Regions:
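N-terminal core-binding DNA-recognition domain of tyrosine recombinases/integrases
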Residues: 1-90, 105, 109, 178-179
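DNA breakage-rejoining catalytic core of tyrosine-based enzymes
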Residues: 7, 73-75, 85-104, 155-167, ...
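Short coil turns linking two alpha-helices in DNA-binding domains
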Residues: 48-49, 129, 188
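Short, leucine-enriched amphipathic alpha-helices that occur as contiguous helical runs
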Residues: 56, 99, 115-117, 193
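Short, charged phosphate-coordinating catalytic segments
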Residues: 64-76, 123-145
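Conserved tyrosine-mediated DNA breakage-rejoining catalytic core shared by Y-recombinases
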Residues: 82-86, 126, 135-175
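C-terminal catalytic core of Y-nucleophile DNA break-rejoin enzymes
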Residues: 88, 154-220
Length: 220
């Protein structure tokens, strides 16, 4: 067998792991007999994007930091290799006209899409991250103001953000008042993303946009 120990692992081995993650989908096809023992037929390895690989390496570094914090090792090799910053594509936005078209769309025959539409429009109105959106409760609403601590920055800068709520945002809150524990219905992030796409298709918003292919690193 093969074992890694936190007190002896070297930076080179972290980089070897990264190379394995990058090429795992190739190894899966080249050595099918080896991978049979893991029963991966339903979820075979696929080529990962640079963003996914960066995320995995950050999590691995977190494990190294945890081992140091817990006193298991003084080996700081987890800090001796570079993790590149994620490359982001050029953002694109709905126009005000498109946003209002979505807000005013009649989706009564598809109530699930109504929920995704309301979540999306509310998030657009307050400018919060998805994780913050699904964490809000009634306690975050003070009059017509949304107040919250952004999760991404609360450890570095514990500063409350205050966002005045527009008429549209207040109307959305009234639709869900008292219907759930959170301020608004919650969804898994992947469900939310798919739901937004479905809403836009239903509303006929399908213009071409340029996005970054995070696997190839090229805009498509």
């Amino acid at each position: 067998g093969f074992t890694l120990y936190c007190e002896t692992i070297r930076p080179e081995e972290y980089l070897d792991f990264r190379e394995y993650v990058i090429n795992e989908y190739i190894h899966y096809n080249d050595y099918p007999e080896f991978y049979e023992q893991f029963s991966l037929d339903m979820h075979p390895p696929k080529q990962m994007s640079s963003t996914q690989i960066i995320g995995i390496m950050h999590h691995l570094r977190i494990v190294g930091h945890w081992c140091i914090k817990m006193g298991f090792t003084t080996n700081r090799s987890c800090d001796a290799f570079t993790i590149p910053a994620a490359v982001q594509g050029t953002p694109f936005y709905l126009t005000i006209e498109e946003r209002d078209k979505v807000y005013n769309a009649n989706l009564q025959n598809k109530p699930e899409l109504e929920v995704y539409r309301d979540l999306f429009i509310f998030q657009s109105m307050v400018g919060c991250r998805v994780g913050d959106l699904f964490s809000f409760t009634k306690d975050n609403i003070v009059g017509d103001i949304l107040q919250y601590l952004p999760h991404k920055t609360m450890r570095k800068r514990s500063q409350t953000v205050s966002v005045p709520l527009t008429t549209k945002a207040m109307e959305i809150l009234k639709r869900y008042d008292g219907k759930q524990e959170k301020l608004l219905p919650t969804k898994q992030v992947y469900q939310y993303n798919e739901g937004i796409r479905a809403v836009l298709r239903e509303c006929g918003i399908n213009r071409m946009v340029t996005i970054l292919d995070t696997v190839t690193g090229k805009e498509v």
